[in-house]
């Protein structure tokens, strides 16, 4: 059974970038882990409780089919990852020892958000024996060398959209709304002759 580790700088990044693929991998009986590094408490709008994103994270990942035993949520401060990159690296090294993942799904090296950039660069250092794919974050990517596409069914995309709907506190930050992600999946699907897909770029691929 393949072990797949999703690295999300903030809660909801994994759902945005590879939520459909997470559903697909779980359906194919892969052992999928999801690690969020920040619940972005400072970005929670007024009117929502301070634990809003933590609770939304639990609901969203449950919607995707993830086991709660395969979830980890750290408490790093949003937009401050560059100042604590060594701590983040050490957490990743421990994750590598504890989980020994075969495949990492993480932000692209071309992601301009400072927190996403730290996760990408430190992941490359920490998970030296794992294959690594960078997922698409259209809001932040300068470019994306989309050289891996994953076929997705309509139901898998629906589960991704349902997971994103769980993040009530973040709706105003989703430019284009939830429909944007459905339309993006359609565009990626058209590129490879199917209805829906998600794309990734190969950072490192290991054949054992």
Question: What is the predicted role of each segment?
Answer:
Residues 120-123, 148-152:
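Short, surface-exposed, charged loop/turn segments at secondary-structure junctions
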Residues 78-82, 140-142, 156-157:
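A short acidic, often aromatic-flanked loop/helix-cap motif at beta-alpha or helix-coil junctions
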Residues 130-151:
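Short, flexible loop segments at boundaries between secondary-structure elements
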Residues 193-208:
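Short, basic/aromatic-enriched C-terminal tail that caps enzymatic domains
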Residues 1-131, 165, 180, 184-188, ...:
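Active-site beta-strand->loop->alpha-helix modules in alpha/beta enzyme cores, enriched
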Residues 129, 153-155, 205:
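Short loop segments at secondary-structure junctions
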Residues 150-170, 175-180, 185-186:
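A conserved mid-domain beta-alpha-beta active-site/ligand-binding segment of alpha/beta enzyme cores
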Residues 36, 73-75, 134, 149-151, ...:
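Structural signal for conserved beta-strand scaffold positions within catalytic alpha/beta enzyme cores
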């Amino acid at each position: 059974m393949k072990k797949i580790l999703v690295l999300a700088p903030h809660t909801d990044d994994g759902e945005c970038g590879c939520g459909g693929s997470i559903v697909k991998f779980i359906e194919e009986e892969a052992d999928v882990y999801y690690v969020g590094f920040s619940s972005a408490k400072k970005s929670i709008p007024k009117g929502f409780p301070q634990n809003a994103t933590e609770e939304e994270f639990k609901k969203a990942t449950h919607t995707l089919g993830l086991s709660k035993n395969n979830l980890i949520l750290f408490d790093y401060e949003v937009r401050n990852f560059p100042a604590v990159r060594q701590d983040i690296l050490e957490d990743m090294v421990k994750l590598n020892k504890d989980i020994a993942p075969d495949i990492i799904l993480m932000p692209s090296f071309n992601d301009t958000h400072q927190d996403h950039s730290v996760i990408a660069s430190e992941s490359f250092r920490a998970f030296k024996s794992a294959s690594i794919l960078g997922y698409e974050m259209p809001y932040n990517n300068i470019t994306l060398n989309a050289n891996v596409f994953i076929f997705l069914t309509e139901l898998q995309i629906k589960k991704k959209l349902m997971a994103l709907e769980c993040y009530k506190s973040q709706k105003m930050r989703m430019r284009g709304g939830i429909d944007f992600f459905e339309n993006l999946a359609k565009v990626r699907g058209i590129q490879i002759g199917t209805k829906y897909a998600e794309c990734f770029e190969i950072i490192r691929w290991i054949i054992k």
